[in-house]
């Protein structure tokens, strides 16, 4: 019953999955395998196929690093692999939200001027959905509000042992710099957010030539 409520609430507040048509077309079968990315693709597929073991279960040891931190240069397939995992699980009826970092924050901002759910409603969904996929973390505007909101979501999932997948063009130190508010230049919350993600996630690194330049 709790799972059905989560699905219903996420559809009402965020949409079916938050995924646009471009995300929905990205599957493992449409991923272009190369020598540079085949190990990353295999790791992503293993994660999707073994996802049930990533979820916290009553009476079972905490699942440990049950998320993925997918990093690499632009155009190397990070978003495709993250979306392929999401689509694999959605096809099995599992609740998943997959959004860019910018869209995730914009959805929260819309609650300030519309009746489409309150800020707390949206945050609750992001914190409790069985899998949250955040694409392009580090592309959001580096404001105090943005990093505070991102930390709130990541920390909520950390405390609940829920799996989270993020993709980024940056290594951890560059990401901390990108997420540090320009108003204060205080990196404490950005560093705490990335520290949480490093504790929650296994790393997958993509290399090679950008698909977009081929």
Regions found by a protein language model. Give the residues of each.
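Short glycine-rich substrate-engagement loop in P-loop NTPases that contacts/grips substrate
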Residues: 40-41, 90, 94-128
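Pre-Walker A adenine-sensing motif
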Residues: 43-61
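Loop/turn-to-beta-strand initiation segments
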Residues: 94-95, 128-131, 160-166
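Dynamic helix-loop-helix/coil hinge segments at AAA+ ATPase domain boundaries and subdomain interfaces
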Residues: 14-42
């Amino acid at each position: 019953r709790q799972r059905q409520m989560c699905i219903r609430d996420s559809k009402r507040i965020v949409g079916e999955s938050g995924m646009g048509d471009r995300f929905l077309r990205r599957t493992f079968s449409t991923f272009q395998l190369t020598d540079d990315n085949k190990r990353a693709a295999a790791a992503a597929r293993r994660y999707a196929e073994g996802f049930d073991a990533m979820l916290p279960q009553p009476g079972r040891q905490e699942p440990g690093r049950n998320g993925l931190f997918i990093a690499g240069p632009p155009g190397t397939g990070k978003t495709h692999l993250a979306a392929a995992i999401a689509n694999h699980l959605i096809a099995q009826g599992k609740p998943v939200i997959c959004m860019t970092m910018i869209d995730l924050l914009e959805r929260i901002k819309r609650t300030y001027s519309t009746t489409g759910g309150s800020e707390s409603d949206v945050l609750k969904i992001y914190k409790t959905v069985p899998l949250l996929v955040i694409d392009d973390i580090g592309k959001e505007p580096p404001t105090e509000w943005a990093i505070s909101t991102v930390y709130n979501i990541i920390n909520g999932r950390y405390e609940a042992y829920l799996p989270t997948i993020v993709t980024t063009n940056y290594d951890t130190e560059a990401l901390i710099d990108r997420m540090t508010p320009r108003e204060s230049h205080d990196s404490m919350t950005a560093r705490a957010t990335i520290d949480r993600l490093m504790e929650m996630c296994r790393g997958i690194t993509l290399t090679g030539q950008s698909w977009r330049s081929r």
